[in-house]
Amino acid sequence: MQNNEILKPAKYFSELEKSVLLALVEKYKYVLECKKSDARTIALKQRTWQALAHEYNSQPSVSLRDFKQLKKCWENIKARTKKIMAHERREKGKLFGPESNSHQALKEKVASMIPEQLYFVQNQPDDERGYNHDTSNQEMDCKRVSLLDLEVLIDEQGKIQTKPFRKVPETNSLCDDGSPPQSIDKAFPNGDLELLIDEQGKIQAEPIRKVPVTDSQCAQGSPSSSIKTESFVVPERDVYEDQNSIVNMHSSESSLHSTPLFPSSKISANRTYGRKPSQNGIFTKMHEEQHHQQMSILQLQLIQMNEVHVAKVQQIERECEMAEEEHRIKMEILNKKKMYWERKLQTITKEWPVASFNRPFPNSP
């Protein structure tokens, strides 16, 4: 290198150049983001990066770059996006603060290209006890809580106890024989109750005003027989109000001679929370990405096989041309030999005429 030659630093990628690079990477992402590490896949990735660099340099208003620079820039953008999104997840989990708007468009585009590397399954609520839960209803809707069936037991003293039990179909209608369902067995002596189930699973009972509820009667049941039953409503809500699930139970009035069938009443309720959007969509998208990736690899393999076939055909054509050339040269040599022997034969014929061979020898009798 000469002494007067000065090394110039590489130019930084502008926003336009980054946009062009992201568009090209999104075009070939099924090959570039493939997780395989065998020699064939690595060679395929390198050829794809070279093709991407050729397309990139053919775009207007961009600086000339080789495929190594473009690959390094894409890796830096991907690592920076992962770091930013991880930081936002931590901040959102701790403080539920607003998201940062810096590089929002670039971050969303990169996140849409590599969702399986950025999204993850949320932690269970038990792992978030140290975080601040005093948030709005919208934040509470994003919390993943598995559905839990509870069995509420109300004894004679009015005490309430809960325990999990098997899920049974809930109904407020009477059975065919006129008996009430097994989940409702006892009348409340103090009127209607309102059960409040909070996030920690604590249950509180408060008296509420009576709401008329119509129970379905069986066709075989006699109109004179009256049974004291309780009807309850478990609202299947997507949005919780003040972190409580309200269970309204109504006790209808009946005749005075009715007696409780069992010493305790069993009330089944479902703890329904606002859940975070399901991950099934993400898993489906990941399967689609894998399917498109496999289809792209198969397409590239077909292209390679076609190129090999064309190369073999060209090789056979060249061999045919070489064989024809060799045959032509051999024919020329044979023709030259033929002409040589014809000329030699003519010379011999001129020197030794045929009539001289018919004369007798001088000493012949």
Curated annotation (Swiss-Prot):
Signal peptide: none annotated. It holds the Pfam family Myb_DNA-bind_5. Keywords: Coiled coil. It comes from the Eukaryota. Residues 301-337 form a coiled coil. The keyword Coiled coil applies. Residues 13-78 form the Myb-like domain. PANTHER family: MYB_SANT-LIKE DNA-BINDING DOMAIN-CONTAINING PROTEIN 3, REGULATORY PROTEIN ZESTE. Belongs to the MSANTD3 family. This is Myb/SANT-like DNA-binding domain-containing protein 3. It comes from Xenopus tropicalis. The lineage of its organism: Eukaryota, Metazoa, Chordata, Craniata, Vertebrata. The gene is msantd3.
